[in-house]
Amino acid sequence: LVYADLRDGIAVREAVEQANPTHVFHLAAQSYPKTSFTSPLDTLDTNVQGTVRLLDALRKSDAEIHVCSSSEVYGRAKTIPIPEEAPFHPASPYAVSKVGADLMARHYAEAYGMRVQVTRMGTHTGPRRGDVFAESSFAKQIAMIEAGQIRPIIKHGNLESMRTIADVR
């Protein structure tokens, strides 16, 4: 795991040089759609320009790169499962930023011969996922219940939504 602020091109380049990776799984992002409405510029800088900074830092390497886009690029799906060829119809600044990152990743693969794959999963989760997301919130609440810190009642939002969730560990 390599830490660097994607908004800092020098830090990204130094992190790549120091790690000298053979494989890169790029999951770093401002990933909360609600935040993208209040901070669209930060979302675009982190997700689009940050992805470009990372790809540019990796351009001379031979690393295999996996860029995690999002099913949010499709907007409200007309069919389930969503075919990969479905047109983009982003419904939030977050989704627009993922379209931009997706297209820039494909551009770097084609223009520079980089080995880049892009996936558009529904939800990625793991130990560093914020508790504004359902699965992280549930886990945190369960841990607090087990520790006797809160009453055994789990607060939740819409339980009708269905998601594909991939653990990134």
Go through each PLM region and give its residues:
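NAD(P)-dependent short-chain dehydrogenase/reductase
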Residues: 79-81, 103-169
